[in-house]
Amino acid sequence: MWLLIIACAVILVIGILEKRRHQKNIDALPVRVNINGIRGKSTVTRLTTGILIEAGYKTVGKTTGTDARMIYWDTPEEKPIKRKPQGPNIGEQKEVMRETVERGANAIVSECMAVNPDYQIIFQEELLQANIGVIVNVLEDHMDVMGPTLDEIAEAFTATIPYNGHLVITDSEYTEFFKQKAKERNTKVIIADNSKITDEYLRKFEYMVFPDNASLALGVAQALGIDEETAFKGMLNAPPDPGAMRILPLISPSEPGHFVNGFAANDASSTLNIWKRVKEIGYPTDDPIIIMNCRADRVDRTQQFANDVLPYIEASELILIGETTEPIVKAYEEGKIPADKLHDLEYKSTDEIMELLKKRMHNRVIYGVGNIHGAAEPLIEKIHEYKVKQLVS
């Protein structure tokens, strides 16, 4: 009996000491930012981290998901977060905070890794205690955990709203709801202003950034009193997420072509949405080149693109690479695909593909679609050799 009592007492003391150590780590970081939402959290986390680093903060950023990373102000090397076999656990945030403090940082920008509403509360109130909260968006996802309605998802995200701090949000149907919650917590609300994010600025990124992503990060800069010039420069210097959709300037600094790497967006809807966004930003899309990578073991996908994607992109030239291109050749010959010219490079080598491509790179968009594996991977590496170095000033 006494052994049980002593064991319980020891566990209690250890728990109290651990909590005190963690609170000491939290208190050692005057700037703590919690990025929550459904889509775009990793991008906003990276852009915000870039801003703080540019402004002179010793900042550590942390992204979550399948490729969770630690980002540091004092080295370009990112550290993958190694997880236990059971997967992500919000308790890892304690180790993140400890490492951040021991490294000498004075700011942390952390993507919220909790989905369950109760865990979101624990993440904010016990593990991070952010004084700046960011809610990227309220969309339908994880409905089984946070739903079943958008209203309940919005309610779950109120855990991100700090007390006596700042909340950065986009203007949405939940703006007034979040503002009321923030008022109850004596927190100032900053509405992200997309009018400050021009298409010309977005084209400077080598990956796809949406206006909301940049304006939310700019809102964090406003909360910290960081000037916009520093903020814009910091975002451009922020390293992209490994899974970011890359847009590379090619050949000429004055009239570059742009390679849009959409090979990994291997479904019709995503591929068309990317193309729509590329046009909206203002890239030279009047006479694009579409590169379709086909795979012998993905003939169903090739057929889907022949029916549901390529007919809806007016291309100057369509280049087919990889294997089993016949479904698209047939659709083109039947007049279903509005491309002015077709180049069927089935089974051709990367060098042979580049021989055709490099003469066509100036001042136009080259959009790679279909499949990332197979012929696309070595081609992407080769295209990178023609990348124009972006100057950030």
Curated annotation (Swiss-Prot):
Stretches assigned to coiled coil: none
Record-listed E.C. numbers: 6.3.2.-
UniProt GO cellular component terms: membrane
Needed co-factor(s): Mn(2+)
Listed Gene3D superfamilies: Mur-like, catalytic domain
GO BP terms in the entry: capsule polysaccharide biosynthetic process
Highest taxon in the source lineage: Bacteria
Entry keyword annotation includes Transport: no
Traits of the deletion mutant: Cells do not produce PGA.
Entry keywords, A to Z: Ligase
Effect of R360S: In strain: IFO 3336
GO molecular function: acid-amino acid ligase activity; ATP binding
Protein's job: Catalyzes the biosynthesis of PGA (gamma-polyglutamic acid) from L-glutamate. Both the 44-kDa and the 33-kDa forms are required for PGA synthesis.
Protein name: PGA synthase CapB
Gene this chain is encoded by: capB
